[in-house]
Amino acid sequence: MWIVLALVSVGCSDASELVPPEHVFDPCAPLAIAGVDANAAELASIADASQLWGDVGISGPLETGAGDSVGVAFGAAAPGVFGFYDDAAAIIHVSDALTAGQRAIVIAHELGHAFGLVHVTGRGSVMNAGNLTIVPTDEDRGDVAALWGDCADR
């Protein structure tokens, strides 16, 4: 399953060719992010990913008591695959071969997909395919606001 999905996760498509995901979440609304059989370090990476979005004003992820939830599972992946968002099941899969910082960025990237964002080229973005270093930027926040409105206005 990883190999088939890896082909989707590492390739970029023209946005006009993308099929809307089944599970897209309002990033300004409460959203529980739960580690699936995650250890303490993996849970910390989930919290760090939520904080990365919080640093640019996206406030929803990791609030307790949320009606909606996204799972995060960690495990082995094909070489060169860092993670993917299984929108049919609302689960983010993350390679367990990554460092803590890389895991947080990959989770933040996959949360971007859960918010409805697609891969970005031409500028530094958490939504760059294969990204392991760029955290969510103000431009990424702007992309979220273009889809959902500005969280600060709610």
Mark where each language-model region is.
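Sec-dependent bacterial lipoprotein signal peptides
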Residues: 1-10
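Zinc-dependent metalloendopeptidases
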Residues: 12-154
